[in-house]
């Protein structure tokens, strides 16, 4: 399942440094056919200790963790929605992503001049969010003009409902509230899905701090960002982009040593990946064997048949059933055979809702 987060930010906030850290990740692109690696795209493996345990247990020929794609969205400046900077190019790129990571400068440094002269993370956030809102309003107004006339003429129920939902979105934006804060029904979400509204996408505010502040209490800038994020149910991740860039160039052993020296357990990039995973409601199931141990990303709420289709469409079309054991049972009993002997293995049908950590063998017939 190919999922992408778009990284946005004003000039001199640390976005380029962060993206350097992402693109320095040593990942085998051929293992991820969905990832057409371009200069503005980086792929990061999703940290998962369970995969290391499975690797030890099976000693597979191939070992493929699940991965996440980050896209560097260039051209976001004040006025981007009206064509400033890269304007329309920026808008077309950001509409394609599943989530937005907004890099916010939360450090003081006289050597790095802020585009507006003074460090103010909330002003920066509001500058970017205003551009996203204006872009959404333009789409809404253009569509409303057409569909309203049609609805008045035809009295078509679907058109009338679309007008109602678009008016609701417009009102929210005019009140400085992103569309994601609206309590839309599943039907309403389906109606506006094709528009890929920017302010409907889940968002993470990435607070870029100094190295000396890692592992310490949040500085005043970060506290302001967290307070702002709470109001719109957004997530905040703090990291030092410069440190992440340095970590990305190290071996796993040296990386671990550097993290210990900094007094932190997890890299900021790993925290970012997991936060992105969380806001999109993602989970992982595994396929295991001597030939390959692999992690697969799915959206919570997907059933066994749909999850089989993530591997290959033939698996979904010819789905018969899924042999399922939980990761915890496999670790506790030590082998698939012992799990089966204990009566803990299950045969599940197409409607079974997959759980994070399920280990599956799919039976299918095409």
PLM regions: where:
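Conserved G1/Walker A P-loop phosphate-binding module
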Residues: 1-111, 147
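C-terminal-of-GTPase-core extension/linker across diverse P-loop GTPases
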Residues: 2-8, 13, 19, 146-353, ...
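Short capping/connector residues at structural and topological boundaries
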Residues: 6, 34, 39-42, 49-51, ...
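Glycine-rich, flexible loop/turn motifs
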Residues: 25-33, 40-42, 50-53, 82, ...
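Amphipathic alpha-helical transducer elements in NTP-driven molecular machines
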Residues: 34, 48-51, 64-70, 84-97, ...
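Conserved Switch II/interswitch segment of TRAFAC-class P-loop GTPases
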Residues: 42-47, 74-81, 95-159, 172-185, ...
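A ubiquitous short alpha-helical element
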Residues: 58, 128-132, 241
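Short, flexible surface segments
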Residues: 96, 355-356
């Amino acid at each position: 399942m190919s999922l992408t987060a778009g990284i946005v930010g004003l000039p001199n906030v640390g976005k380029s440094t962060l993206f350097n850290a992402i693109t320095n990740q040593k990942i085998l692109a051929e293992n991820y056919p969905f990832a057409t690696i371009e200069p503005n795209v980086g792929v990061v493996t999703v940290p998962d200790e369970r995969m290391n345990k499975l690797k030890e247990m099976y000693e597979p020929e191939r070992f493929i963790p699940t991965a996440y794609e980050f896209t560097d969205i260039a051209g976001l400046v004040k006025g981007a929605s009206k064509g400033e900077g890269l304007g329309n190019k920026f808008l077309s790129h950001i509409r394609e992503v599943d989530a937005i990571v907004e890099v916010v400068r939360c450090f003081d440094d006289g050597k790095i001049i802020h585009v507006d002269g003074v460090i103010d993370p909330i002003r920066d956030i509001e500058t970017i969010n205003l551009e996203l809102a204006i872009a959404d309003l333009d789409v809404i107004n253009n569509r409303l003009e057409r569909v309203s006339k049609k609805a008045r003429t035809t009295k078509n129920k679907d058109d009338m409902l679309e007008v109602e939902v678009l008016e609701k979105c417009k009102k929210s934006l005019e009140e400085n509230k992103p569309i994601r804060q609206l309590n839309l029904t599943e039907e309403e979400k389906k109606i506006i899905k094709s528009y890929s509204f920017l302010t409907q996408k889940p968002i993470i505010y990435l607070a870029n701090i100094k190295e000396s502040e890692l592992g310490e209490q949040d500085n005043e800038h970060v506290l302001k960002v967290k307070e702002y994020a709470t109001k719109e149910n957004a997530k905040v991740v703090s990291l030092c982009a410069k440190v992440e860039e340095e970590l990305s160039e190290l071996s796993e052993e040296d990386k671990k040593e550097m993290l210990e020296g900094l007094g932190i357990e997890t890299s900021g990039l790993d925290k970012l990946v997991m936060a992105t995973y969380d806001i999109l409601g993602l989970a992982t199931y595994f396929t295991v064997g001597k030939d390959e141990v692999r992690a697969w990303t799915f959206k919570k709420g997907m059933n066994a048949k749909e999850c089989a289709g993530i591997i290959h469409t033939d698996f979904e079309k010819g789905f018969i059933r899924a042999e399922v054991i939980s990761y915890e049972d496999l670790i506790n009993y030590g082998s698939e055979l012992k799990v089966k002997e204990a009566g803990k293995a299950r045969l599940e049908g197409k409607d079974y809702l997959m759980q994070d950590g399920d280990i599956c063998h799919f039976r299918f017939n095409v």
